[in-house]
């Protein structure tokens, strides 16, 4: 069925892990009649969590689009993971939504996941609604949670449905709009007499009236005159407040037992903005701002907000259409590449179920298979109106591990499989370290990379293991030293001869410099390049641990040659012998890479961060507040001390903190740590190439 944009609601369902987001989505799908049986997260049978890893871990790891059709309205519910290692789902989903439904567990209260969801909605200027799940459980405390919400999120919080425990232990739900109460028997609504919740009832009504009155001058006058609002005025005023962000309505119920979900669904339709209200400012081909509003008759403009890489079906691109329609006959180009995109079938997707649809209309969400060049964040548009929409902002991947191929012969498959994986998870990155030659995969944490490894095996047949990346140390010298390098060898009737005196001295920076200061013709000029080549080749391996030498100047002073036996190769060998003789006597030292740590943490945590930086042999540079009210601690820390910092920061801040780390320079490694690094280098075979 095709819906007009005014009858579509695109809603991000977000919150802390385990708060009941997926169960709520599954329950709403079941109540709509789309499924005959309600799936369970514990059994791995929900429409949202269809990935094998999700079923195994009993948690959402990917965002899922679940369309729920009810009473002439289509609700595109974008169920996103609550685990912090999988925040990419929320980052991509928010770009396709007009509203955020924040789930809060009736048992756990307002946790970090709810805070993050609220901040995400604020940052992206999306309407907000709160649903308190598990409200029928004995240890659920709605009014305590309501206070937490007000403390965390301010005066916009406005209760609309509240629970009341009855004498028989069951829970009824009071609709403050209609001032009626209902209980639920096998998911069916039954009206009952209004339970007595004491002075709270009048206070709740008064608070709701006050919030609604602030949205309209006429309602404000009526409020001050003490006149009650009609149900229509309540709904209209509440919807206006939700659109402007003045009001964040709070509902409650039980997804497992299908309680009060009818009231939630009705008010999602009445209070949350429709897809018709969406407007995005992009850029045209001349980088000028262009506002795209939802309009079926305008040139096509659509946005790829999510990609799924399937080894059998191919790439599946999830698309939000902003204007026009998208169908198999649409003439569109990729604004990033300028190339046309041939469209195959357009699809409606519900979890893993795909259904053909004639077109994806303006305001709606659907999918297209096997697009040639499009990737997440790309804009598909009519060539007559080329527009590039803003790309999503993804969390920074700071947890690095090295890749080791499990099966011999799979080396060539790894980069291709990882490229496919990165298509569907842009928070993952993959590089080859030019120093260590290791393949490095980066993600948001240990779970993130564990799941990536599992997907590579299950989806692409590539098996890898992860190990701690090697640290790219360097070596240098502290003093000058001069040494002779004499290469003389007789092979049959032809000999090899090269003789040099080279002075090696430390210099600032990380270069290896070569100079010559030869008087007379002791070493002919045509052999100078060979001497330099020998020095540079030798400097690839230090004498302590085999790491590259930096901050070194080599000056050719003297030497000798043979008119017949001297050659380029002989002088290369002579230069290497001089290097090997001089460097051990020049005070060789190991250098460790140092990076700048920029950690964003709540106001309560800077002291802990500074203490941890000191423990990790770092130096605190300063601290400043950021635009989100958090504190930003800047420090310099050795790279070798940063491997587990992601885990530390997450535990310290309960997932609120994040950081970046960028290499800045090399510094001398403390002598007490040299022996350990040298031993590790020998175990890794750092001297193998040099000795060969």
Task: Report residues per predicted region.
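Structural and coupling elements of P-loop NTPases
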Residues: 1-692
